[in-house]
């Protein structure tokens, strides 16, 4: 089973850049090391490194908290 987080909701709980903490949005693109997120406010997009944060992700109706370094790999290699 491939875990694809595109169109999942994400909230940044902790990040190396404090300006990004508490930001929420929808994941529109995922690469091996980054998420591209469409923020709710002002229809802005940001690209963040997965390894630099802790996130709350709502995936298929269930929310979970995960350290980003655990997501650093190609989506199709995750099981």
Swiss-Prot record:
NAD among keywords: no
GO cellular component: cytoplasm; ribonuclease P complex
Record EC number: 3.1.26.5
A Gene Ontology molecular function term of the record: RNA binding
Keywords for this protein: Cytoplasm, Endonuclease, Hydrolase, Nuclease, tRNA processing
Listed SUPFAM superfamilies: Rof/RNase P subunit-like (SSF101744)
Subcellular location as annotated: Cytoplasm
GO terms (BP aspect): tRNA 5'-leader removal
The keyword Nuclease is assigned to this record: yes
Main location: cytoplasm
Catalytic activity: Endonucleolytic cleavage of RNA, removing 5'-extranucleotides from tRNA precursor
Family the UniProt entry places it in: Belongs to the eukaryotic/archaeal RNase P protein component 1 family.
Subunit organization: Consists of a catalytic RNA component and at least 4-5 protein subunits.
Protein name listed in UniProt: Ribonuclease P protein component 1
Species annotation: Saccharolobus solfataricus (strain ATCC 35092 / DSM 1617 / JCM 11322 / P2) (Sulfolobus solfataricus)
Gene: rnp1
């Amino acid at each position: 089973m491939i875990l694809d987080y595109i169109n999942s909701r994400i909230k940044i709980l902790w990040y190396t850049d404090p300006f990004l903490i508490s930001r929420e949005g929808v994941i529109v693109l995922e690469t091996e090391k980054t998420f591209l997120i469409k923020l709710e406010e002002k229809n802005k997009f940001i690209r963040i490194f997965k390894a630099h944060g802790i996130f709350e992700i709502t995936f298929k109706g269930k929310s979970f908290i995960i350290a980003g370094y655990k997501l650093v790999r190609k989506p199709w290699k995750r099981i």
